[in-house]
Amino acid sequence: WQPGGNEPLLKALYWVTETVTSPWGILTSAILCGWFLWCLRFRLKAAIGLALLLFAALVIGQGVKSLIKDRVQEPRPFVVWLEQTHGVDGKYFYSLHRKERSALVREQLQDQTLVPNWLRKHWQFETGFAFPSGHTMFAATWALLGVGLLWPRRHYKTVALLMVWATGVMGSRLLLGMHWPRDLAMATLISWLLVVVTCWLAQRWFGPLTPPPQEQQEIAARKPE
């Protein structure tokens, strides 16, 4: 991986990745959860239960991600690039505390014209390990939940938008120097497993995911949303 390229495209992808980055990821989750509940039209008790289940899936996914990161300890692409071009030893870099890593990134890039200022700040904020991608896991989980929960009710446009958004997040992680392709693949696999379990639990606890008979005619007449 090397920095550089089409800066307007990279900046656009940066804003896509920010929809998942803390603290904006919390707002994204709240909006998506509200939209899911509106689309599914569950009764209040089931809606609250489903909301808790959705957030539990996200929290568990992020916990699994953190556990794997601490075990595998794979350096991010931009850290490898710093090692190759600035002589920053990767093992030394990750032996530092997060604030010290951020300061080191800022110091090494202060005279670097190839890396725009907004990307430097993003690197300073994201100094953890690479494998697997937490951003990908977050976005892929929501996109796959859309397939599992919203597709049966013909919310095709919503599912398509979620897929495009998740793909944008994944592409941004590669092009911004944050992850390798294998990080994205593993994150997507974990997300898929989580979604399978989540949809199974949702059906077991809150009823079938397919619409009840009284909604069938309405859904059949509805334009895809």
List each language-model region with its residue ranges.
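Membrane-embedded catalytic cores of phosphoryl/pyrophosphoryl-handling enzymes
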Residues: 94, 99-225
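Interfacial segments of alpha-helical transmembrane regions
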Residues: 33-74, 80-85, 158
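Hydrophobic alpha-helical membrane-embedded or membrane-associated segments
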Residues: 22, 53-57, 187, 191, ...
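Hydrophobic alpha-helical transmembrane segments of multi-pass membrane proteins
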Residues: 16-20, 51, 55, 130
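Alpha-helical transmembrane segments
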Residues: 23-27, 50-54, 157-164
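Juxtamembrane/transmembrane-helix boundary motifs in multi-pass membrane proteins
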Residues: 6-10, 37-49, 53, 122, ...
